[in-house]
Design a protein with these regions (language model features):
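Surface segments flanking catalytic/ligand-binding clefts of nucleic-acid enzymes
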Residues: 3-171
């Protein structure tokens, strides 16, 4: 589900609040504001960003440390070949695009299980493939599976030419 409404509080407003909150009591708040990103269109995308993007020391997989970081709802316009591969779909909006790895991580909740949605997703994924972008789909169950999330993060780091130095239960 995507929410077309404006956020209740913007990152800019949170940053202003964080500058005002100087007490050590607000250290965690200031850190959270520093790590937050704009552009999420759903709670699941925000959670996915929180699991993958922040540095390892905060319990995430450090994707934001890769060149270009992790961009939420990044638009990729298709070239002519990719447009044909996508059956006329002119562009894709990636839930979370990692430029260094040429990977789009897509959260597919229950809405993506409907037939017309699967057809559209397949077309856009073909277009992205034509642009050299690999699409990694994360479903509801995988969002709760730390071993799966680690494996996905490891593959992203590898595609970016790096190495994830993190281990959970021997993966």
């Amino acid at each position: 589900i995507h929410y077309p409404s404006e956020p209740v509080v913007t990152i800019k407003e949170l940053q202003a609040m964080a500058r005002y909150a100087k007490s050590s009591e607000y250290a965690n708040f200031r850190t959270a504001v520093r790590l937050a990103a704009t552009g999420s269109r759903s709670p699941a995308e925000s959670i996915m960003y929180g699991m993958f993007a922040p540095p390892l020391r905060f319990g995430a997989f450090g994707i934001s440390s890769l060149k270009g970081g992790m961009l939420l709802n990044h638009r990729i316009d298709f070239d002519t070949t990719s447009l044909h591969m996508a059956s006329g779909v002119p562009y894709a909006v990636c839930d979370a695009y990692i430029p260094a790895a040429h990977i789009d991580t897509e959260y597919n909740g229950v809405g993506h299980e409907k037939e017309n949605r699967r057809i559209h997703d397949g077309q856009r994924n073909n277009g992205l493939k034509g642009m050299g972008v690999t699409v990694l789909v994360i479903n509801r169950d995988q969002m709760r599976d730390i071993v799966a999330l680690e494996a996905i993060a490891r593959s992203i780091h590898k595609a970016a030419g790096g190495l994830l130095r993190y281990r959970y239960s021997g993966v």
